[in-house]
Regions:
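Catalytic phosphate-handling regions of large nucleic-acid enzymes and associated NTPases
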Residues: 1-222, 280
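Charged, surface-exposed alpha-helical interface/stalk elements
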Residues: 193-281
């Protein structure tokens, strides 16, 4: 009896690649809504939480705390620096030294010069209702949390981006914290599951929204759509001053947009940042 099933190789490749793309998206590229964390962020936070002594420790030591739970050691230190980034709205780490600020294109110092620990806010933000599963390494005597349930969705407050394989790129803008809290209170005070809150939380005030209110509400209701954003800028005496940029954008993105004009000496760009963003064109 023939044990083989004939199948078109092209269709088989499409199916397998689609499954692989979903695995990458769900396991690594996209954050979970229950805690707003990608898998590596969850493991880093959990490792710091479990081994917290209350003292500031070097990034290499923080990475060692997460290593038992994550299979890719080279990515852990970079994730820790992102968690301690000065541009985050919610501070999940207490830091010491120059941790940089990605929104202002300020790079962090080398790992050996900076230290940190899990913040008091992070300890309060994540609740204790945790379900455990075997680690990806399959160690018998060690489990990891399936998720770190959070009282507020981090991916909507600190923002998030993900580039999966064969699926749409995800970019979540940072939302206003007070608006998020009001939104959840509004939901919790109504028992009707079909109840729609009076207003959705707006993006933070560091960007301009070019989409209409109806488009924004549709995105939040359905989870689908594109949000058009732009910088906050002013113009006076032929000088453009930019004081706010959309999530994941920085001065280098602005420079690339006007690179041709800069090379032709038609425009000049100066990054006048100190602590706050200020790009002058």
């Amino acid at each position: 009896m023939n044990q083989f099933i004939e199948k078109d190789a092209t269709e088989l490749a499409k199916e397998n690649y689609r499954e692989y793309g979903l695995y990458v998206a769900q396991g690594r590229a996209y954050p979970q809504l229950i805690d707003g964390c990608k898998s590596v962020y969850k493991r880093v936070i959990y490792g710091m939480w479990q081994r917290d002594t209350g003292k500031i420790v070097k990034v290499s030591d923080l990475a060692a705390q997460a290593l038992p739970y994550h299979p890719h050691p080279t990515s852990i230190s970079g994730v820790i620096v992102q968690l301690g980034d000065g541009g985050n709205k919610l501070k999940l780490m207490d830091t010491q030294g120059n941790w940089g600020d990605s929104s202002k294109k300020i790079e962090a110092s080398a790992d050996r010069y900076i230290g940190g620990k899990i913040s008091a806010l992070a300890k309060k933000l994540f609740c204790e209702a945790i379900e455990y599963c075997p680690t990806i390494k399959g160690e018998i005597d060690r489990d990891e949390p399936e998720a770190l349930p959070a009282y507020l969705p981090l991916c909507f407050i600190n923002g998030s981006s993900g580039i999966p394989s064969g699926l749409p790129t995800l970019n979540i803008p940072t939302l206003d914290i007070i608006g998020m809290i009001d939104y959840y209170i509004d939901i919790l005070t109504h028992k009707d599951l079909k109840y729609k809150p009076k207003k959705f939380p707006k993006p933070n005030l560091e960007i301009n929204i070019h989409s209409s209110v109806d488009e924004w509400n549709h995105i939040l209701e359905t989870g689908k759509g594109s949000l058009k954003t732009g910088p906050i800028m002013s113009m006076e005496n032929n000088i453009i001053t930019i004081t706010g940029l959309p999530a994941s954008k920085n001065v280098d993105h602005v420079r690339k947009i006007i690179e041709k004009e800069i090379l032709l000496d038609k425009l000049d760009l100066r990054d006048e940042k100190k602590r706050e963003l200020c790009i002058v064109i």
